[in-house]
């Protein structure tokens, strides 16, 4: 149920909770991690924030980020494998298929042909938090659902063309918002793409 982005967004918008956190491993695979976190919390009163990247490790490709940005600017679709793999069902940048967010043809290629998704369920954009604050009308700084693509956000009308390849039929996106320096590769890549 925690992968239901519409339900999560309604909880965020209508529940009155100040903060909602859903871990990236929302299925039964996360039960043992949740039990361990609860035990730690009971003993220590808090649980340190952990990384969602707990899987096998691959070499990072930070030295190739400029080449990646150039390939993306040429409207290419790229398979990305770098660092430790994600835990949970969402591709959070270490095992991902990436493309530009502003191209409807790429949406068809990536979402419908490669990932076999329905036309109304496009893939998700990745953006810096400063961009999310500007382009998404209902994004608030620190929104925890955006850390693992577990909520939807309305795109401001003047920016819909920038998200034409990833926007849902109702004008929302399931965004991965980069905060702090958690993902240096994607952060640098997104910054470089602004040049193209």
Explain the meaning of each model-derived region:
Residues 2-196:
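Flexible beta->alpha loop and helix N-cap segments adjacent to enzyme active/binding sites
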């Amino acid at each position: 149920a925690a992968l239901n982005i519409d339900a999560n967004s309604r909880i965020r918008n209508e529940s009155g909770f100040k903060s909602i956190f859903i871990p990236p491993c929302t299925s039964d695979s996360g039960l043992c991690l949740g039990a361990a976190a609860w035990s730690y919390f009971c003993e220590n009163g808090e649980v340190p924030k952990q990384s969602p990247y707990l899987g096998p490790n691959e070499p990072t490709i930070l030295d190739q980020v400029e080449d990646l940005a150039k390939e993306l600017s040429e409207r290419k679709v790229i398979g990305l494998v770098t660092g430790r793999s994600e835990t949970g069902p969402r591709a959070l940048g270490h095992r991902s298929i990436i493309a530009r967010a502003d191209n409807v043809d790429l949406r068809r290629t990536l979402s419908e042909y490669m990932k076999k998704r329905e036309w109304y369920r496009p893939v998700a954009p990745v953006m810096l938090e400063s961009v999310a604050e500007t382009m998404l009308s209902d994004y608030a700084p620190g929104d925890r659902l955006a850390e693992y693509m577990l909520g939807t956000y309305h795109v401001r009308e003047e920016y819909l063309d920038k998200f034409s390849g990833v926007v849902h039929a109702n004008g929302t996106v399931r965004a991965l918002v980069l905060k702090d320096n958690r993902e240096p590769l994607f952060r640098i890549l997104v910054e470089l793409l602004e040049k193209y």
